[in-house]
């Protein structure tokens, strides 16, 4: 289990100066050729997403104005807050800030032939499945994960195991990304 606080994470500026990324975790850890990766990006200007052949990307707008995603003849999609959207990471996708203001989004990328992610917003206590990896990011409220208290802009990632996330207040929202390994693959085979 790895814990993080977005406010204390290192920031990587994009080469095109249109934004920045905070990498949460990769699996396998510290590998450039990852099977899955979670990150938070701040987008300051219109531009294209980086290409990642063989990967799927699920992007969830956390804050800021809506973002229009365009991919030639494949799709035009308006990304709205807390509504995950998946697309192939090897296609050219342009992002346009519809309200002209900076936006922040959560990204999870998975290698299509190894694993698949599912992203949802939780508003009540839940328990993860034991054989799956995952990432949680607190949008608001206070959540208990084991003996650790997680509050706004904090989270955790894990590569397997069963975990209960308990909402400690009447209201709260948490982004949860679950990683499902495809047949013939598991985290034990990779490490």
Curated annotation (Swiss-Prot):
Query: Its domain of life?
Result: Bacteria
Pfam families with a match to the protein in the record? HutD (PF05962)
User: What family, per the record?
Assistant: Belongs to the Ves family.
Which HAMAP family does the entry mention? Answer: Ves
Q: What is this protein called?
A: Protein Ves
Q: Which organism is it from?
A: Shigella boydii serotype 18 (strain CDC 3083-94 / BS512)
Q: Give me the gene this protein comes from.
A: ves
């Amino acid at each position: 289990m790895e814990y993080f606080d977005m406010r204390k994470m290192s920031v990587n500026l994009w080469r095109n100066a249109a934004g920045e990324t905070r990498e949460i975790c990769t699996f396998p850890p510290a590998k450039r050729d990852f099977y899955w990766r979670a990150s938070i990006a701040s987008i300051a200007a219109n531009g294209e997403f980086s290409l990642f052949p063989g990967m799927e990307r699920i992007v969830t707008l956390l804050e800021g104005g809506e973002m229009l995603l365009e991919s030639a003849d494949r799709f035009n999609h308006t990304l709205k807050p807390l509504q995950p959207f998946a697309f192939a990471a090897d296609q050219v996708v342009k992002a346009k800030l519809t309200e002209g203001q900076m936006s922040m989004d959560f990204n999870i990328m998975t290698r299509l032939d190894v694993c698949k992610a599912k992203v949802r917003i939780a508003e009540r206590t839940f328990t993860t499945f034991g054989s799956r990896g995952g990432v949680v990011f607190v949008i608001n409220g206070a959540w208990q994960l084991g003996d650790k208290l997680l509050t706004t802009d904090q989270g955790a990632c894990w590569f397997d195991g069963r975990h209960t996330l308990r909402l400690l207040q009447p209201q709260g929202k948490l982004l949860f990304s679950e990683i499902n390994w495809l047949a013939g693959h598991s985290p034990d085979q990779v490490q």
